[in-house]
C-alpha cells in the first residue's frame, strides 16, 4: 500500500509542476572529509578446525559501515600481532593507521573465549580492552558486540551493530504465483530467518520499541489490513479492519500506540490507536493524501508525507491538536520521513527536479540544508539506525529490487546481501541490548 500511495503522490507531483525552493535552504551533493584509518588485525585462533566466521573481518566491516573508519586491508599489514605485547607501533604508523585492534580466540569447555584490545597508534596507549565468550554459532554476535564497544569508546556514540533488520522479499514464479516473505536478519543482511510467508503482498514491517513485536500490512484477505506479530512465538493478531486503505503502521516511542493510515472517511489520513483500548483518534484532515507517519521522541509529534500543498512534502503535527507545519522546502518531492536519534536530521526520499532520480537525502533541521546521500535513482523506504549513523534503503540495480546501506555522512555506499527475488521495505530495529 505504501508503494500505491507513493505512486499517487508522484502523479500529483507531476501535475503540480516544480515549485521554487526556499532561498535560505542549501542543497549539498557531496562531502570532502575522510574516514579515520583503523587496522583490525586477524584474531589469533588456538583451535583445530577453521572457524565459520572471521571476527576481524566482521568488526572491520562494521566500523567501515558507520562511515567513521576506513579499515586497512589485511594484505597491506606489515605484521599480524594477536596480543598487546606483540604490537609494533612503528608498523602501524608507517601504514597511516590511527588505531589498531588485536585479539585472540581460545576454545574453553565447548565455548570460545575472545580477548581483544584497541590502541591509539599515535600515543601508543591502550584505548579499550575486554573479553567476551560464546558458542561457535555466536561468533557474529560477539563480533558485533566488540564493534559496538569499540565504536562507543572512540566516538561516544552507542554502537548499532548488534541490531536487526526487517525486510520483504517477493519471488515471482509465474504471472499469478508470487511468494512474499517477511525476513529478519542482522543489520548487515547476514543470518536471515523467515517470520512470515504469504501468496499476497506484505508491506511496511515495523519493529515495536521493545524489539519483540512487529507490525505490518498484509493483503492475505485480498485487501490491506494491519497485523501485529510476536517475533519469538509467531503469534499474530489483526488490529485493523476498516474500509479502504489500512497501512503505514508506526509505533509510538513507548510502544503503547500505533499510528497508521486509513481512508475510511475519504482521503487517506493519519490515525492513532491506543493499543490497550483499541480506540482510534484522527490526526490529519482536509484535502489530499496524508501518509507515512513517523513519531518524534516526545510521543506527541508525528512527521508525515502530504501533498496538501500540491506536491509531496514532509510536515509535522501534534497529535493533541493544532495545524500541520511544513518541514521540507528543497526539491519537488520529499517523502518517507525518518528522524535521527538526536532529532537533528531528517532522512527522506528526495527529488530535486524533474520526474526521476528519487534519492535518499538528509536535511539538517536546524539549518534547513539538504545533503543527497545516494547515487542510485529509484530509492525508497529509507530506514535509519537507532544511533543515526547509517541508513538502509531499497532501490533497483540491474532490474532487481535490492537493499543498500549508506552512512549518514555519505562516505560509505554498499549493497546488502539478501535472498533471491525482489527485496524491499527495510526497517531497522531499536537497540536490543
From Swiss-Prot:
It holds the Pfam family TolB_N. The keyword Transmembrane helix does not apply. Residues 1-21 form the signal peptide. InterPro entries: 6-blade_b-propeller_TolB-like, PD40, Tol-Pal_TolB, TolB_N. One of its GO terms (cellular component) is periplasmic space. GO terms for biological process: cell division; protein import. The keyword Cell inner membrane does not apply. It is found in: Periplasm. Keywords: Cell cycle, Cell division, Periplasm, Signal. Belongs to the TolB family. Part of the Tol-Pal system, which plays a role in outer membrane invagination during cell division and is important for maintaining outer membrane integrity. The Tol-Pal system is composed of five core proteins: the inner membrane proteins TolA, TolQ and TolR, the periplasmic protein TolB and the outer membrane protein Pal. They form a network linking the inner and outer membranes and the peptidoglycan layer. PANTHER family: PROTEIN TOLB, PROTEIN TOLB HOMOLOG. This is Tol-Pal system protein TolB. The gene is tolB.
Amino acid at each position: 500500500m505504501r508503494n500505491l500511495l507513493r505512486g499517487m503522490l508522484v502523479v500529483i507531483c507531476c501535475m503540480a509542476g516544480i515549485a521554487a525552493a526556499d532561498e535560505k535552504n542549501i542543497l549539498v551533493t557531496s562531502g570532502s572529509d575522510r574516514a579515520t584509518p583503523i587496522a583490525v588485525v586477524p584474531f589469533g585462533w588456538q583451535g583445530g578446525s577453521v572457524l565459520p566466521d572471521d571476527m576481524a573481518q566482521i568488526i572491520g566491516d562494521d566500523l567501515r559501515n558507520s562511515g567513521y573508519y576506513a579499515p586497512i586491508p589485511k594484505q597491506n599489514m606489515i605484521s599480524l600481532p594477536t596480543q598487546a605485547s606483540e604490537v609494533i607501533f612503528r608498523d602501524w604508523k608507517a601504514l597511516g593507521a590511527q588505531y589498531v585492534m588485536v585479539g585472540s580466540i581460545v576454545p574453553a569447555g565447548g565455548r570460545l573465549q575472545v580477548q581483544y584490545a584497541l590502541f591509539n597508534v599515535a600515543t601508543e596507549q591502550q584505548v579499550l580492552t575486554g573479553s567476551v565468550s560464546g558458542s561457535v554459532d555466536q561468533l557474529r554476535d560477539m563480533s558485533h558486540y566488540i564493534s559496538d564497544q569499540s565504536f562507543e569508546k572512540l566516538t561516544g556514540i552507542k554502537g548499532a551493530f548488534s541490531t536487526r533488520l526487517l525486510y520483504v522479499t517477493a519471488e515471482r514464479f509465474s504471472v499469478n504465483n508470487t511468494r512474499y516473505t517477511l525476513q529478519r536478519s542482522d543489520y548487515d543482511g547476514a543470518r536471515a530467518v523467515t517470520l512470515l510467508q504469504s501468496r499476497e503482498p506484505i508491506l511496511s514491517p515495523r519493529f515495536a520499541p521493545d524489539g519483540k513485536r512487529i507490525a505490518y500490512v498484509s493483503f492475505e484477505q485480498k485487501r490491506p489490513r494491519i497485523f501485529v506479530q510476536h517475533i519469538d512465538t509467531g503469534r499474530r493478531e489483526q488490529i485493523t479492519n476498516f474500509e479502504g486503505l489500512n497501512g503505514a503502521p508506526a509505533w509510538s516511542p513507548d510502544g503503547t500506540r500505533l499510528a497508521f493510515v486509513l481512508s475510511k472517511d475519504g482521503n487517506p489520513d493519519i490515525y492513532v490507536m491506543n493499543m490497550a483500548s483499541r480506540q482510534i483518534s484522527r490526526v490529519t484532515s482536509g484535502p489530499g493524501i496524508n501518509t507515512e507517519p513517523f513519531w518524534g521522541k516526545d510521543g506527541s509529534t508525528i512527521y508525515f508525507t502530504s501533498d496538501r500543498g500540491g506536491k509531496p512534502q514532509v510536515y509535522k503535527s501534534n497529535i493533541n491538536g493544532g495545524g500541520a507545519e511544513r518541514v521540507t522546502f528543497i526539491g519537488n518531492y520529499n517523502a518517507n520521513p525518518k528522524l535521527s536519534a538526536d532529532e537533528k536530521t531528517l532522512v527522506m526520499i528526495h527529488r530535486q527536479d524533474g520526474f526521476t532520480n528519487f534519492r535518499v537525502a538528509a536535511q539538517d533541521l536546524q539549518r534547513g540544508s539538504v545533503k543527497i546521500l545516494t547515487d542510485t535513482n529509484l530509492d525508497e523506504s529509507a530506514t535509519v539506525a537507532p544511533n543515526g549513523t547509517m541508513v538502509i534503503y531499497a532501490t533497483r540495480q540491474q532490474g532487481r529490487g535490492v537493499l543498500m546501506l549508506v552512512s549518514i555522512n555519505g562516505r560509505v555506499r554498499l549493497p546488502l546481501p539478501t535472498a533471491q527475488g525482489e527485496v524491499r521495505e527495510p526497517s531497522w530495529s531499536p537497540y536490543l541490548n
